[in-house]
């Protein structure tokens, strides 16, 4: 009976993590629609602007390739390319998202026409969930994400794409949303 109960508990955790990822995606979509309405162009939580990536990926193919091998939370090589949804309070390997300054130290433009209302990704996520944090049901779990930047304008516009995963096993626990 013990192995069967253990399997049942693991199935429950898997279902719970997928439900939590779904909640994150719904809020990301709402955020995108609201920023589209109020800022003139939709962006996702943590994006300074629609055409700026979050994390270390610029295209989806690279993410897919890494997800094939990203099976544990402690994969430093791949994990360091991802951003924590609600921030790293334990100093883990995932990045914390920060606001990109309009100008770099040498006065070069980094974020042209970025919205004044933007904030760090973890703050934007935190506000989307009424100052609550969604926690992974897994001991080593942690919600992480990346945003592939949008591009173009007018009829040639390509919306950003978000990928959210549970660091317990991103290979199995991830979802991708096109907007």
Residue ranges and their predicted role:
Residues 5, 30, 80-82:
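Generic detector of bulky aromatic hydrophobic side chains
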Residues 4, 29, 41-43, 68, ...:
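Arginine residue identity/basic-tract feature
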Residues 35-78:
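Short, glycine/small-hydrophobic-rich surface segments
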Residues 64-179:
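Intrinsically disordered, low-complexity regions enriched in Pro/Ser/Thr/Gly and acidic residues
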Residues 1-12, 32:
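C-terminal juxtamembrane segment of a hydrophobic transmembrane alpha-helix
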Residues 11-19:
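Juxtamembrane membrane-water interface segments immediately C-terminal to a transmembrane helix
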Residues 8, 20-39:
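N-terminal alpha-helical signal peptides/signal-anchor transmembrane segments
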């Amino acid at each position: 009976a013990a192995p069967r109960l253990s399997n049942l508990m693991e199935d429950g955790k898997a279902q719970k993590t997928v439900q939590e990822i779904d909640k994150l995606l719904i809020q990301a979509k709402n955020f995108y629609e609201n920023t589209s309405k109020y800022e003139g162009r939709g962006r996702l939580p943590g994006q300074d602007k629609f055409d700026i990536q979050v994390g270390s990926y610029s295209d989806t193919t690279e993410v897919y390739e890494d997800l094939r091998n990203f099976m544990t939370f402690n994969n430093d090589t791949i994990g360091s390319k991802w951003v924590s949804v609600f921030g790293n309070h334990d100093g883990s390997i995932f990045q914390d998202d920060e606001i990109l300054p309009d100008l770099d130290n040498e006065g070069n433009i980094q974020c042209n026409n970025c919205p004044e209302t933007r904030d760090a990704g973890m703050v934007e996520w935190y506000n989307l969930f009424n100052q609550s944090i969604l926690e992974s049901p897994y001991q080593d779990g942690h919600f992480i994400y990346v945003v592939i930047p949008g591009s173009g304008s007018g009829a040639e516009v390509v919306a950003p794409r978000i990928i959210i995963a549970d660091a317990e096993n991103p290979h199995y626990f991830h979802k991708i949303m096109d907007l």
